[in-house]
Amino acid sequence: MNRIKAVGYENNELKEKAQLLADQLNLQLDQNADTCLFVTSEKLTLKIRNFSLMFADFSAMTWSKRRGEGKRQGLIRACKPTKGIKILDATAGWGKDAAILATFGADVLMLERHPVMAALLTDALSRRNEADIQKICLSLIASDAISFLHSLQEKDYPDIIYIDPMHPERNKSALVKKEMQVLQQLIGTDHDAMELIELSLSHVKSRVVVKWPQKVKPLLPPDASIDGKTVRFDIYMPQFSSN
């Protein structure tokens, strides 16, 4: 899949909205593009040839499902999200892990450096109703995680930093879901993952959690790991932490 180069739209009533988005992201406006950000009357979507329309979703219908999924996941055991805990999801992607963490009461800030993915996440957040906004603490900053961490003052360090780096092994598995296939092709491998982990360890209060393929050697030796069927969650403790 080539880099997203255009914004399309469902009908002429949405042309102005699509043009504004195209200008914002420095993309072309092309209603006939077969690979593009695609504006519909209901949501912003990602249109890819041979795939159905894809979109981020933080609506109420997904919360109970994701919370149920989360109870069975190493993600929750590793991050221990509870009310009042501040979690920084440094590599948001489609926002699914962030949404699961938020349903357990944590205050989750997503970072996403790819402008197309950030636009999809922003749209998903905007579609929430007021009740969802009050119930779930989930927000987004369109930023590179390394730059963001460098800008943080110590008093603003999160309790937990969660990192789910892109890595080449994801391309090799037939079990990879279509959303992850597209994300992998759109974003590519996170070659700065090691730098991000090391920087995170000096900008976090409690722990850094890294999601990594089960059979792949960790980038750094972890202090602990929680194994799943295909992935594991490597846990790193900053030296000054007492938790």
UniProtKB/Swiss-Prot annotation:
Signal peptide: none
Keyword rRNA processing: yes
Subcellular location field: Cytoplasm
GO-annotated molecular function: rRNA (guanine-N2-)-methyltransferase activity
S-adenosyl-L-methionine as UniProt keyword: yes
GO terms under cellular component: cytoplasm
InterPro entries cross-referenced by the UniProt entry: 16SrRNA_methylTrfase_J, SAM-dependent_MTases_sf
Major location category of this protein: cytoplasm
Enzyme class label: transferase
Catalytic activity: guanosine(1516) in 16S rRNA + S-adenosyl-L-methionine = N(2)-methylguanosine(1516) in 16S rRNA + S-adenosyl-L-homocysteine + H(+)
Keywords for the protein's UniProt record, in alphabetical order: Cytoplasm, Methyltransferase, rRNA processing, S-adenosyl-L-methionine, Transferase
Similarity-based family: Belongs to the methyltransferase superfamily. RsmJ family.
Function recorded in the entry: Specifically methylates the guanosine in position 1516 of 16S rRNA.
Protein name: Ribosomal RNA small subunit methyltransferase J
Organism the protein comes from: Legionella pneumophila (strain Lens)
